[in-house]
Amino acid sequence: MGNRWRKLAWRCWVVVLAVAAVVIPVASAADTEASAVPANLVGRWTRTVTAADWKRAGATGFVTSFVGPYTMAVKANGKVSIIDFTATFSPLSGGRLSIRGVPVCYPKKGLYRWKVANRKLTLTKLKDTCAAEVGLFTGVWTRA
């Protein structure tokens, strides 16, 4: 009976370790996925995206038909609600941030410079290979 219990105990430990190996990294990734953004970046922002914005970004296809006003809500944890999806702003040093989570761009992320002055948020592309993300985010946003 002792040998049987040892096998059972061993199997239980294997299951526990397997579950821990999956759950712990997922929880850690979720915790670090979005980090706190500066307070002056938090809030609701609006801007009108034009056909010229899409053209400048080099966008083609269906996204170029999405012209008009957009509102994004930036939360303190870096989550950004825009259109019908949630992107993530991750602050970096030197007034820069990375943007990721745009469905048509996934898993790519873009690098942008940001500045807030006089209730205006300016996002400037530094490096981003996804034209849809560039066309949507690059430009001047007004605090709503």
Predicted features and spans:
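Short, solvent-exposed mixed-charge patches
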Residues: 142-144
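Contiguous, well-ordered beta-strand patches that form the walls/edges
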Residues: 51-136
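Secretory targeting and sorting signals
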Residues: 2-30
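Intrinsically disordered, low-complexity regions enriched in Ser/Pro/Gly/Gln/His and often acidic
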Residues: 1-6, 18, 37-39, 47, ...
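N-terminal helix-cap/turn-to-beta initiation motif at the start of protein domains
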Residues: 30-46, 53, 73
